[in-house]
Amino acid sequence: YGGTAPNTLLKYALNYAHTGSYTDGKAVLDVCDDAAKINWEGEWRTPNTSEWNELHSECIWTWTTQNNINGYKITATNGNHIFLPAAGYFNGASHYYADIQGYYWSSNLNGSVQLTSYYMYFDANNRIRKDISRGYGLSIRPVCP
């Protein structure tokens, strides 16, 4: 979860249920472990669930292809837009659903189920906010306030 270097697994990826490791009890990603903050520096960071919720409910999502890559063009009421590629996800070295589905981390961890963190899932027909094991390799769309 939130790797700051390729193929790294941080302390958030494991918990007692799977490895016998400790359970950290955190609800929000630490700044020092935020891949967006580490890789982009400055004020960039991984968006939180409130920001994903706003994007989900307040913007227009249009499935499209840009530069031969499927994904959503997300347009705000003021006309600003971003493109989120359907990049799929990684489980270990295996890459799944590229160009079909998108999986994007939020900075919020599921405090009640220590193994999971919240993310935004989408495909051509669905957009769902869910939680998933922190051990998966999902995309990060950095935001800057």
What is each residue range found by the language model?
Residues 1-145:
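Conserved positions within compact, well-structured domain cores
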